[in-house]
Structures are given as structure tokens and as C-alpha cells.
């Protein structure tokens, strides 16, 4: 322990790294606060609570994770240059990551508002802050007076070259085929979230077992710090159930509820349960015992919920039959339609029982990539999956906004599909998949995975293998564990586990697990994994009946793509001054053009015709002159010895005065006028120097065959015909066209040039 300004500190070593826990230096007015550090990454986590008289019907826990840009020495990119507005997607996901393992550890019936804030105040961009925040939240709550049945600790498990690594660095994760975040108590893993590259089920189970052992020092450190600096927990008395009322409700409702909870259809079952509650309330209100005070009847809803839970769980354990009549391993009936939307790039309708998802895939250009401001700098994403859960999908009326749950489910489905996508070099499109939940009765996020895969295949995206997902449940009664395949919404609420697993026939790509029981034996987890694999293979088989492979061609309404490789030296010419040329191309064709320094030009256009036009316009700036080919160019300069003609963009040729016409030309300006078009034939290319002839074109027009010797280079210039710094299409420092060692006497005498050959 180190005492710094009344601070108390403990350390733990995990995976060879020191984790520092410190309290008492910052945020001392919070009920609980901890500074948790690994390397140069520091997260400050605080916990506060506030009593409330309101009965919200749920535990009002708020968890907010925030990344401060100063932590990485950066200034926010917003207009106000501060962290304002909605949390980023990562901040939302990490907030959920913290919330899920700690929420079940508060006593049932606690109504106080509890707020946990985790602020990243230093980031070395090497050690990730999310798992520190999970452990820090448990530590802050443990130090506070808030009733909390912790501790739990968080860690990341990677696998590099076949070896498990705990809390690998961000750079090390680039080589890992496994990325699992787990939270665990002393006795068991309580939360799992992760992605993998087609990893077998057995490896996941082994990773969780290994990780649980490795994080025990973090549990020890929390307990030690709590012993040193923790506050006494305030007393909390859980609400006592009215035994007489519970017995009366059970007598009135058990038989009817048993019947209602055998109705397979969700909405009909909901109506039947509602009718049972109304019948019970009607009988109780008429009871003289409650004539004067009906306050106790507020508990009827909770009593009925507990009764429903008992009926369903006992039936599953005793009979092996579930609410909709299935056994424990059967997947609900599956219906699939592909290409359901006529103008979408790719679409699919995936239905599993009463859960139905309409999923749409859209292809875009590289300019459509999502750009985000983060601690590690500007980050781009070329694949996005957005999950929507509108109120109508469960027959409710609620405000319409994107919830944390929707962001979390979308992120899970995105993880599941990411490993099967083609590399950007092979398929440079930006991909967006939107999953619209049409109806929901459990496992809607896994329906988004299945439908998302089908929509990508319908769009013609060359995925490496199909992916499917399924949600597993658990009923634990005493020492009995019953694993449920493809759980309903009611089974999720009444059960002890929600374990979502997605993958291909070869292995797992994404997992998410939340459990409500204290511990889960390894053999039970392995059984859940195996049942999930059997279900996944069944679902993949059903998907294969509709689409065996991605469509061979992209949708006619999808962007068209082409790549052109140009000389890097002419990139500035393609772009033009102030982007003039590139803007003209995009305005004319509607194409999106991305030019790399290597000379690689990616063209995305709305139609095939527009793409071809854009390609031609780009290639126009990268043309090469060919000897013997005619070009229509513009006269850029008129000299005494001839004219400079731009035959191609930024490519000029010298037309010597002797090649301006079939007749003798006294002055080049007699034939060549600045800015006018001139058709010329390229007659010589010597490195960067190009010579052209208008005379050759005129001879051909007269039916006289052009021969190279007809345009032989003249022996010398006319009198006074030296170049004095003007451009001549050559890079010879302005030397004249003579081969006489540079003498410049050359006056005309009797039609001959001194020291020269006859003119042609």
C-alpha cells in the first residue's frame, strides 16, 4: 500500500502486466471512486446513488462510459472542440459491457437510482480501456455504501499462434483469431462478448475456463482495497411478499395460467394472460379484506409473474416441453425469401417462428465509409450493420429512437458477419446492412445475422461462407440444468441464460452470453455449445435451400466499379487546378472517384454507362502518343521554327516549320494560330521529346502515302531560327534542330542553308 495525499493503492499482476487500483485521491465526494490503470491507460470510475420514492417497475441503474480526447493528447473534432452530443458507438457498447455483469448483482427490489460513470482520462493507445472500466465499475461499487454483491472482474482473451493471451495489446490483437471479453466473479463467468475467426466450440469453452483462472488476482485486489478503504454497506431490506395474497392469487390463477402458457402464439398467449390477471383482480377487489385498502393489490402483477415463471420452469424440467410445445432441442419453423425488395441491392426476409426480420444490403463507394473520431485517431469502417427494433414489432407504442439495445444487437450481428466478407482489395465496396425487425418473439438479433448473410448473398457480395446464429437458454432447478435451443422471448425472461452463438459450418464468429445463476459448470456450457452447433447447421441447411451461393452478378441498381492504373506523375493533372478536372468528371458522370498515390484509381458509378464514361475520361489524361498516329490538338505556342501543339492532355509536340504544310512556309504564324485546332501526325518520339507533322496529314488527305523518310529531320533552321527559351516539345535546353555541333550561322543563300543539307 502507498499513501499519497490520503490515497490508498493496491496492485495486481495479470498476464505479466501490473494493474493499479487507487482510491482517495480523486472524486472523494462520490460514494465510491477508483483510479484503475494498466500501462499508460487510466480509467476513473465513480459510483453514486440517490434514494427515490418512485416505483419505476425496474431497477434504475445508469452506466455511462466516456472517452476523453485529452486522454490521448487530441482535441475533439466537433465545432465546439469538446465532447458533446450523443455517445459514440464504442462508448455505448462499452457502457453495455459494464452494465451487463453488474446489474444482476444488486439486490432484488432495490429502487434507488444508481449511476456509474467511467471516464478514460489517459490512453497509451496500447492497453485497451474497456476491460479496465468493467473491473473499475465493480471496484467503485464495492468501495461505496451501495448494496452490491460483487466483486466481478473483466478481461480480454486473445489467441495468438494457438496460445491464449490475457489482455493483449491493441497491436497484438491484430494477430489474434479470438477476441473475447469476459466478466467473472470468484466462482463463475457471468458475461461473455466476443468475436472469432471460425474458432471451434471447444476452443471457446477452453478460453473461458482459462480466462476465469487468470483474472482471480483482480478479484483479490478488489477485496483487499475494499477492506482497506470501503464504506459500510447501508442496510437494505428486500420487499417481503404478502404470503396470504400470494396464496390467494395462486389459487385463483394457477389453472388458468397453466392453460394460457401452453398457447403457442405470442399475442394470443399475451391476451390470455391478461385475461387471467383481470379475472384475479376482479375477484380480489370484491374480497372484503381489500375493500378499504387496495394498496396490497399493486403486488398482484409481480406475484403473477413469479407464478408464470414457476409454471413454465417446472413444466420444462418435468415434461421436457416448452411454451410452444417444442422439446428442448428443436428449432422453430424457418421461412426465407430472397430478393424481396425490387430496387434494393440485396434483400432477404428471414422468419423463425414468430420472429421475422427484413434485412437489406446496400453497396456504396469508398466515400461512403464511416469515419469516426476516436482516441486512436480517425477510424474508418467499410462494413456497417444497423439493427432496428420499432415498437410495432411487439405491438407496442413507444418513442421512436435508436436505443442502446439496438446498437448492441447491431454490433453483435456485425461481428458475426465481418469474418466472411471479402477483402477490400478484392471487393472495394462499402457495405451497409440494415435489419428491420418486423416481428419479435425472441432471438431477433440472430435473425438479423441470418437475414444479413442472405441479403449480402442476394446482393452478389462474394462472402467466404454462409453464417447463421441461434440463441440458447437455460433452466436451472436444483442440480438440474436444461439447455434450450432457439429460445422464445418469454423463455429469455423466465430463464437463467441468454447465450447467442453465430458462425459458419466450420466454427464460431460471434458469441454473447449473460447468465443469471451464480455459476455455470463447464460441461453445461459445452452442451449448450454443441446444441447451438446442431441448430446452426440446421439453419444453414435451410438457408442453402434458398441461396446456395452469392449471386454471380451485382444488382443492376448497385454501383458499378472499375479500377484504372495511371502514371502517378499525372495524378495532379487528373485532379486539375483546384480539383477542376475531377469535379468535371464527377459532375458529368455522377461517379465517385478515389485516387491513391500509387496511381490506382477507383471509380464507382450509378450505371455501367456512367462508369465507362468516367473511365474513359480518366484515361484521357493518361494517354501515350504513338508514332504514325494522328491527333487533333491545340496550338499552344507559335515559334519562328514552328509550332507547339498539345496533342494530348499535358503532352506537347513540336511541329517544325518544314512540317506545317506541303508548300514552303515562310512564317509559322502563316499556318499556325494560337488556340486553334491542328491535326498532326506523330513522326518521332525520343524520350520526352515528340515531333509531329501537319504536312504528313495533308499528304494522306491527297492520297499520297506517308513514309517516315518524307518527314526526315531538316539539317538546320532558317536564318535567325534559334530557340530562345521557348517550349518546343523537347527537353534539350532550347537547342535548335540542327546536327552541326550547335553552329547558328544559317542564313538562306540560293535556296540552300550554309553547311546544311537540302530541304525536303
Swiss-Prot record:
InterPro entries: ExoRNase_PH_dom1, ExoRNase_PH_dom2, ExoRNase_PH_dom2_sf, KH_dom, KH_dom_type_1, KH_dom_type_1_sf, NA-bd_OB-fold, PNPase. GO terms for molecular function: 3'-5'-RNA exonuclease activity; magnesium ion binding; polyribonucleotide nucleotidyltransferase activity; RNA binding. It is an enzyme of class 2 (transferase). The keyword Transferase applies. GO terms for biological process: mRNA catabolic process; RNA processing. It is found in: Cytoplasm. Its cofactor is Mg(2+). Mg(2+) binds at residues 492, 498. The keyword Nuclease does not apply. Pfam families: KH_1, PNPase, RNase_PH, RNase_PH_C, S1. One of its GO terms (cellular component) is cytosol. Keywords: Cytoplasm, Magnesium, Metal-binding, Nucleotidyltransferase, RNA-binding, Transferase. Involved in mRNA degradation. Catalyzes the phosphorolysis of single-stranded polyribonucleotides processively in the 3'- to 5'-direction. Belongs to the polyribonucleotide nucleotidyltransferase family. This is Polyribonucleotide nucleotidyltransferase. It comes from Nitratidesulfovibrio vulgaris (strain ATCC 29579 / DSM 644 / CCUG 34227 / NCIMB 8303 / VKM B-1760 / Hildenborough) (Desulfovibrio vulgaris).
